[in-house]
Amino acid sequence: MNIVIVGGGTAGWLSALSLSKNHKITIIDSSIPTVGVGESTTDRLVEWLLRQGIDLQEYIKEVNGAIKLATYHVNFSKKEYCHPFNIRDDQEFLDVSTWAYTNNQPVAPLSNFYNLVVNKQVPNSLEGVAIHWQAGLVPQYLEKLLKNKITIIKQQVSNVKRNGNNIKSVVLDNGQEITADYFVDCTGFHKVLVGNDDFESWNDKGVVDSAVVWNEPFKEFCPYTILEAKEYGWCWTIHTKDRAGRGYVFDSSYINPDQARQEIGVPDARTIKFDVGVQKNIMKGNIVAIGLSAHFVEPMEATNIEFTITELDLLDKVFASSMTVDEFNAELYKSAHEIRTFLKLHYIDNPNSNTEFWTNQKNAKWFDKTYQKLIVENDFDYIKQNNWQWYDVFSWLCIVQGLDIKPKHSIDDPALLAKYQLMSI
């Protein structure tokens, strides 16, 4: 199959890596520089890269990568708390996690990585870890890796020729016309191919929509992403091999970029405006949106790259006729909403700030059903009943307990107590 990818960046080159295994790929990369701050990922990316045949040690070296084991939350609650990755996800582990929370025992120490996080160490194995990397280096490395396997065109698309929901061809700045069986839109918030007609905006859902970003010199190694609540949003710190990528994510309906820069004391921080939401139909006709053109929500738990690789895995199924386009779209639409709900949990209550932003976040009505089930009723079976795939009970409980939300009942089970004592050593 002949597939054209429009747009480079992380999404474009990850798409080229995945799709080039079974298809003829042309990537149209305008070579417009990326913002170049640090990017954070989740533990599922490492397993995905291995499936693509990537040498992880080489990859980490080439992208100035560093190991990530957790997210570490500061000023979201009375105390700092940790949401670590964990290798185990079987039902016994999840039952023990629930027992721990309902009996006021720490949940996070059940993770294989908890003690490493506390001591700022990394495991001997790469199993279950994630990576911090320098964003601009990923396309460079993958281009070098794929240059003899795919066609690379350094141009911009000036026109798109359509036939209903399908694209017949794209026309480049130099007048060249490119045809294909399928077109993949990796143009980010520009959405050059997919447009905005089918885009479900979440700007009315109390989501942060802007950021100011900057880099700082390397100070110390931290195997986790630091998230620090601020007056009108939160800051990230992502440690790569030789520097720290920083960003202040905020809601532009409360403050503007200059006010954000003033709050953090970085007058030259660059501004990014997010297009927050999801395409209702990520695949339509012979067009597929991958990456930011398909979906974006604030990068608090580093879900955006994971969403990209999930899209690519499901797209493989569509092309192999083991999944329909309708199933593809429905699963990704549901996933985007699940991610948004999980991130909303982080905003339930911040005792350290009483700004209008935090007050409105706490009172956001669209979260009511999940709040009722998880926080009021402690019905953690609700996660399983809804077939939520992105975050298991352990992750939800790390956030709920970290926010100092007390359990409403306890589980009396000596067997689970014994298992907890073994797992939390």
Where are these regions (language model features)?
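Dinucleotide-binding Rossmann-like beta1-alpha1 core, especially the glycine-rich loop
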Residues: 37-119
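Short FAD-binding loop at a beta-strand-to-alpha-helix junction that anchors the flavin cofactor
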Residues: 283-300
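Predominantly flavin-linked oxidoreductase catalytic cores and closely associated redox partners
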Residues: 127-260
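N-terminal Rossmann-fold NAD(P) dinucleotide-binding loop
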Residues: 12-13
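Glycine-rich FAD pyrophosphate-binding loop
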Residues: 20-37
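Beta1/beta-strand and adjacent pyrophosphate-binding region of the FAD-binding site
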Residues: 1-9
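Conserved FAD/dinucleotide-binding core of flavoprotein oxidoreductases
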Residues: 229-276, 295-306, 318-321
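Long, low-complexity C-terminal extensions of enzymes
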Residues: 67, 320-425
